[in-house]
Structure formats: C-alpha cells, structure tokens
Amino acid sequence: MDPPSPSRASQTQPVAPSPLTSYRWHSGGGAEKGAGGFRWGRLAGWGRAQSHQETTASSQPAPRSLFRRVLSAPPKESRTSRLKISKSLWGKNKSPPLDSEPEPENPEPEPELEPLATQIPEAPTPDVPVWNIEAFTLLDGKLVLLGNEDEGPRQPRMGSASSESSIHVASGNLKDPDRTPGKTDPEAAGPHQIHNVRGLLKRLKEKKKAKSELGASASRDGPPSALGSRESLATISELDLGAERDVRVWPLHPSLLEEPHCFQVTWAGGSRCFSCRSAAERDRWIEDLRRHFQPSQDNVEREETWLSVWVHEVKGLPRAAAAAPGVRTELWLDGALLARTTPRAGPGQLFWAERFHFEALPPARRLSLRLRGAGPGDAVLGRVALALEELGIPRAPAAGLERWFPLLGAPAGAALRARIRARRLRVLPSERYKELAEFLTFHYARLCGALELALSAQAKEELAAAMVRVLRATGRAQALVTDLGTAELARSGGREALLFRENTLATKAIDEYMKLVAQDYLQETLGQVVRRLCASTEDCEVDPSKCPASDLPQHQSRLRNSCKEVFENIIHSYNWFPAELGTVFSGWREACKARGSEALGPRLVCASLFLRLLCPAILSPSLFGLALEHPAPGPARTLTLIAKVIQNLANRAPFGEKEAYMSFMNTFLEDHGPAMQHFLDQVATVDADTAPSGYQGSSDLALQLAVLHAQLCTIFAELDQATRDNLEPLPTILHAIEEGRPVPVTVPMCLPAPRTQGHSSISAGEKPGFLAPRDLPKHTPLISKSQSLRSVHGAGSWARPRLEEEQPPRLPRPVKRTQSVPAGRPARRRPSAGPRPRPKGSLHAGPAPRGRPWTGASASLPRKPSVPWQRQMDQPRDKDQALGTHRPVGKLAELQCEVAALRQDLKMLSGLVESLSTHIRSLSEQQEQLRTQLQLLDSRLREGTAKLDPGRDRSTNEGHRLKSLECRLAEIESTQAQLKDTIQNLQLLPRTSESQSQPVPLKAPCINGDTT
C-alpha cells in the first residue's frame, strides 16, 4: 500500500486500536510535491516508508510494488537474468516534470469517461539525447554500450516543443553511482559472458578512467546547451531495469523527435530514446526487448488498438493565430502525445493532408486532436475530443468517420476536417490461430481466386496487406507474391498494357511486399535527392502554356539534370537492392520463359518496380517515408515531370503528340535506354550467396493473425453461401476461433513443387506430425489431423542457434567495435549533412557483389522465431538427444574405416552402373536395327502377295454382279407382293358389268427376270 503524507498523519485523530490500524499502511498518494514532482514524491515517500518500517510489520509479506504493469502484458515471470543498460546511460541534468497541458480559456467540457490507467509512455521532448543503437549489443540479457571515447548520444535538436516529458530516477535502481570507473562490476564479469566480454569491458573502462577523472575535476563553464549530450556521460555506470515491472518499449513517431526510426525504453524511474538506421532494425530491436520483458506474450490473450487518422484541413481560425510560425495538429490518446503534423501558416484554410497510422496500441478510450501554435509556449487554439467506441465498427463506417469536427475552445465556425478509423482487436494466444495460418500458407491462391470479384478496392488492399504480413512472418511471402504475379500474367493474357495496372489482390499484395522489403532501399536510393528537390525553389516547368518562352531553355536544362541525377541513383543502386525482390523478379522471368513469353519478363519487372514503387515514391514522397510532408506545388510539379521521364524510360516509350512539350527529353530516353535495360536484367538475377532464407519474420505473429481473422470475418459476413462452401474449411475455422472452441476440421496440406534446388524431399515412409511454416519449401506433407501445438519454452530456449544454422568457427581477430545486434551489418557512422558518395562512371560489366540485405536476419544475435510452434524445434528434445549429436573421439578410426569401405563399394557400384549403361545402349541400338528390318520385310511381303493373286480383280467384279442380282430379286419380290394385293382387292369388289370393269394392266413377266 502507499504511505500517508506527514501532514495528513499529523492531522489524524487517535482512534481505538484495531487489526487494521495496528498495521502501518504505506500510501504515496499524499506525499509532498517537491522539485521532482508528484511522482518523485510518491517514490520518495515509498522509499522512506520501506527504510523506516516498524518491527511489527517485519513478519508481514513484502508490500506490493506500486509500479503497474501494462494491462496487455502478461504477469512478470521470475528469472535470474536482468537487462541492464551499462556505461552511464543517465545524466545529471533531468528534464522538468510534466506540467498539465495549457488549455484554452473557458473550454467547453469534454465528455466524462471512466478513468483508465495510462499505458502509453509520455512523449519525449525534441531536445532529449537520442542514443545511436549501433553502439549497443545484446549479450546475455544485457544491453551493453561499447565503443571509443568519442561515442555517445547524438546531439540534441534545438527547437520548439509543444509537449514536455518528466524523467524521474528511483534511487533503488542505481548501482554504485560513485564507484571508480576503472572497477569492474562482478556481475558484469560473470562466467557466462561470451567472447571475453569481461576483459573487454574492463579494458574499455580503464581506458576512459583518466579522461573521466579529468572531466569530473574540470570546471564546466558555459550554458548547458553548449555542453551538448556529453553531460549525460558522467555519473551513472550501470542502470538495472530487471528489478522494475513497468518497463516498456515503444516506437516513436518521427514528428516527436524530428528523427526517423526511433524507439523509447521507459521504466518507473525514467526513459531513454534510441535511433536506428532503418524501420526494420527498429522493429527487430523492439521485438527482442519486448520478448525479454514479456517472454510469454504469445501465450496470453490481450487487447490491442489500431488507429488511423487523416488530418486534412482546418477553417475558421483567427487570422492572428494562423500567422507565422504556423499551427500544428497534435494527436493525443488518453492524455499521451502520439504525433504532430507539420506547421502550416497563412490566411484562410490550412491544409495538411497527412496520415498517421498506429498499430498495437494498448487499450484506449479517448482520442483528442489539438490545434496548437508552432511557436514555443503557444497555447491550444482548439481541440476535438472523441471516444474510440464511437469510431469503431459497426457505429462508424468501415472506411472511417470523416467529417468537419467543430473545435472546442475556438471561435464559432472553426472546424477541423479529418478522417478517423479505430479498431479494437482481441488477440488470442498464437496456437489458437494455427489452423488459420495453415490454411493461408497452403491455400492462399484458392482464397485469392474466390474473393477477387467479391471485394472492393479498399477491402483488397487491407486483406492483401494482412496476408503479406502473416506470410512474411512465417517465411512464405515470397512464394505468395511470386505466385500472384504469375497468375496476374496469365490473367492479362500477355497484354503488356494491363500488367499490374488494375486494383487486384495481386497488385495490392505486391505493393505491400515491396513497401516492406524495399523501405530502406528507397531511403538509400531516392531519399536524399527527393528531399533536396522538395526543398528546392528552382522552377522546372517546361509546358509553354505555363511558363514564359524566355525561361523555357533554362527550365529544360534543370529538368534534364534532375532526371539524370535520379536515374543515376537508380541504376547504381544494384549493390543494395533487396535480395527478396530479386528472388521474386527472377521467379517471374522464369515463369515467362516457361510460357514462351520470355520478352515479357523485363516488362513484368518494369511494371512492378517502376510503376508500383519507384515512380509513386517520386510522385508522393510523404506516403513512402521520403519526406515528412507533402511538397509544395512547385517541387510537386518537378517531381511529377521526373516521374514521367523515368517511367517512359523504363517502358521504352518516347513522348508523342499527347505530351509534345516533353519531346525534348526523347534524346535522353534514347541515350539511357540500354543502361535501363541492363539494370532491369541485374535486379532480376539471383545471387545464391546473398539470397535470403525463407524465414525472415520479426513481427508479432499473433497480432497479425488477429487482424487477418477480423478482416476475414467481416468479409465472410457479406459473402454468398456458394462462395463460403467453396472455401471450406476456412469458414469453420473462423467460426471456431470466434467462439473460442477447438477447430473441428482438418486443413489439407499440399504445396507445389519447390522452386529452388537443394532442398531434400521427405521420403515416402516418413510422415511428420507437424510441419513448421519455416520448412514448407522442403516437404510436401500429408497430415491426417491437425495436431495440438507443443508447449512453448521460455525465453532462454531461443538464445541457442540451431545445429544446421551454426556457422563454422572464424579465426579470432581484435575486437574494434561491435555490430548493431539485430541488423547484422557492420556499424558505420553516416554524416548528418552533405551529399553521400555514390559510384559514378560506367555501369557494372557484370553482377556486382551484392551487399547484405538490410532486412536480413542478424548474424550476431540468434533470432527468436515469431511462430510459436517453431521454438521447441530449435533445440534437441532431451538431453540424451543433445549428447547423441556428438561422436566420441575414440570411434574416429572406426568411422574412417567405414568411410573407406563405403567409398570402395561406391566405386564398384559406379563401375557396374557404367557397364550396365553401356550394355543398355548397345541393346537399344540392336532393337532399332531389328525394327528397321521388320518394316522392310513387311513391305516386301505386301508386294509379293499382290503379285501372287492376279485374279483379285475378277473376284471383285463378280462381287459387284452378285450385289446387282440381289437388288433385282428384291424388286421382283416387291412386284409379286403388289400383284397379290391387287388380286385380293378385285375379289372383294361386287361384280359389275364387263363394260364398266377394266382389268388392271400388269407388266408382262420376263423369262429371265430382266426388264431390259
């Protein structure tokens, strides 16, 4: 419990003793508010209460920690390892406490909601130190800072901050803050350190001892801003996070720190911010740290919130408020700042057109959009308060709620136009989605074919994104994109004009996959040049109707130079082109070759890479993360013209009469056409040494499957019964997951033949009980019944690499610097400004050695599989099996003899096989000769038979005469029957006079029966 404050205790009147009053209750609710703020008062009061406990309470159990854990997190498990941030990650200067946000005068009351524990960390200020994650490594559960004396947190960015964050230090978390820097912590130098970390840390600390003592004794003159971020490197040598329960890892929106790819680690005593080289590296670090603190996250049920906000425009603000430096829109969720827009200034309406998307948010209740001046200390101009329950389905449309929202606290008529979409997901344990993952893995082509005509464009985009994310986590995204692209080729019938130009599930899946794997490629290839063009004020308009004729030559020259720069960046980007995309493009070209349309291979690559990725990224850099905001009209026109030129160059299509003002660029297209075709051939060539493995997952698979389950349930609710029956057992699986009961059906497992060579197929007698998604390309299993998943091991089971993935031992070499742990790529420092050196000159004559894919798995840290049913397979089943994997040294000679005998047998068998092959070839030749002789004899026999039977023609004539006689006999019989009928008729008639009766004339009978 929390201790009462001294002031409140002094005012308490004495009461009669009771079992409740005999115990000293600890409550920090009324602690004094000092300079550290309310939270620091709670911590100080709690610490004093713990250090001055009465003897009567010593036998009572330990008080419950006042730090609350995240509601979506599982209970903390007992473990001995602790995550520590070493090498002085804390500074003397601390940020001021978080004050309440200034509200507008006389604000209108917001709807009262039931209080909810804050679970989103407080946003950091833009001037906090940001640590480069490349200087850290994760060893034995410890986040260790390594490097020379010049390394440290990045310089803080000075600027206006519209939000404040409080950082407090709990005294119980510090480990010997005043100890000598040269000393080595015994726990850090334990026997379980690998690669001699103990000696490494000791040498680094001794190396900095002299400078640390000198820096401590030297006077610090000047303002704190002049000292930069080096002030935070002086006192703390080790910060223990393992003792806290409220440790959270949180991705940060780029608008908060004006730095991309950052994440924040918070605990009860403070927080630290880290920056990564790419979004993929940031996601891997977040996953590793979260799994350390929440090892059983995949085995518990939790709730997550997805939120998408489109901020369009605002109207009705006072002219003075919209003046420079402008107005921002801030996104607050349950009192925590998530992101902010770029500032906009000017008279009239202010336009942003910015989109914010957040995944895996904790359960939240209220969203607030606040308009605030961009200057330092500006007040809130107005706000929009919304309850998330009103924004979800079915209360709001599936596309989100879009309208003009009145601004509270603003003048009458002021409104903000935005579109908001929220979804609350119930995420079940991973094994509950096992059958759904199996169906998607084995039958995605069948699912896409059945739903293609029944979905809208938005539904296709969402379903394709969910499928790609799930299959990327299980290692089958490449197969999905390759198969869908091949199906799109067959659907278009070889017509180039239709390739990847329609809104189909194939095109949406390809778009999502390229955004995932080529995010860093876009930044490295187009990021710098696109940002320079967005900030440029040079006019490149070449339409004579939109610019003076005197400026036209200068504008054409600028456009030509800009197109050349962009094109050279693209064709020289082969060395860092994603290997995953190269594998997909190679599969497409092989499919075109198998169909007899080899010429369509480059067109297919061009339509996907340029039409769906590179040119859209040039047109809309803000949508692809190349710029923070949409460019101004002038730079936007320049980017549009550049995208036109690059697309026509890729399509080998010169400008015609439709865009006659661009005809001056046709010479540019002719000159650079061969280089473009060479680049298309390069990116579609697979390098076996750098080809990525099938398993690349680093995301929350349970969350992605929950999203897919929710989308499929929404889709199947509107499908006709025939389509549902055609997709069985998927409807049964979805219904069983929704009701929380076991799936009563079996998922048939069948896969096409593997595309790559080198995978061993399963023998006819082996039938595995369960096939891991990572091993799908190796086998074609036949499983009679979906089996229940094995129990998931703890966090320590994934730290050991699998036997088949172990690399051969490398020669020891001096340790200069560690690698960034999840990235697996040598760390390098990139300059903050200035152009990046790029290879110039002629193109590569052949395939250049491709660098390590940025999205590849880490080489220094064994990755924990996201698929829970794979983790137990990463290690031997029992101790005996682990021991049985190593042969005793004493049997080496025996094994060598066996190998020699087997080699002799192999040689004998090889000779026998060769002799049999020779004999078979000779028999085949003899058989061919005998067949030829038989045909010759048959022809001679027919000729001799014809010569020996000269009366064959006479017998033929007699046969014809016999047939004619038969016909005449039939005619006579018919005449005779007619005669009999006539005689009978005459006998029945009454007799009349002979003058009136006339006999029927009959033909005179012929003697020989011939009428001729």
UniProtKB/Swiss-Prot annotation:
Boundaries of every PH domain copy: 193-294
Subcellular localization(s) per the UniProt record: Cytoplasm; Cytoplasm, Cell cortex
Biased composition (Basic residues): 826-841
Gly residues compositional bias, start-end: 27-39
Broad class of the protein's primary localization: cytoplasm
Biased composition (Polar residues): 7-21, 50-62, 990-999
UniProt-listed PROSITE patterns: C2 (PS50004), RAS_GTPASE_ACTIV_1 (PS00509), RAS_GTPASE_ACTIV_2 (PS50018)
Domain C2 span(s) in chain numbering: 285-405
Domain Ras-GAP: 475-683
Sites bearing Phosphoserine, chain numbering: 18, 51, 160, 162-163, 166, 212, 225, 229, 232, 788, 791
A single Gene Ontology CC term: cell cortex
Taxonomy, superkingdom: Eukaryota
Compositionally biased intervals (Basic and acidic residues): 175-186
Pfam family, any one: PH_RASGAP
Keyword annotations: Coiled coil, Cytoplasm, GTPase activation, Phosphoprotein
Low complexity biased stretches: 160-171
Bias kind Acidic residues: ranges: 100-113
Coiled-coil stretches noted in the UniProt entry, renumbered to this chain: 889-989
GO molecular function terms listed in the Swiss-Prot or TrEMBL record: GTPase activator activity; identical protein binding
Site feature: Arginine finger: 501
Gene Ontology biological-process entries: negative regulation of Ras protein signal transduction; positive regulation of NK T cell proliferation
Entry function: Functions as a Ras GTPase-activating protein. Plays an important role in the expansion and functions of natural killer T (NKT) cells in the liver by negatively regulating RAS activity and the down-stream ERK signaling pathway.
Protein known as: RAS protein activator like-3
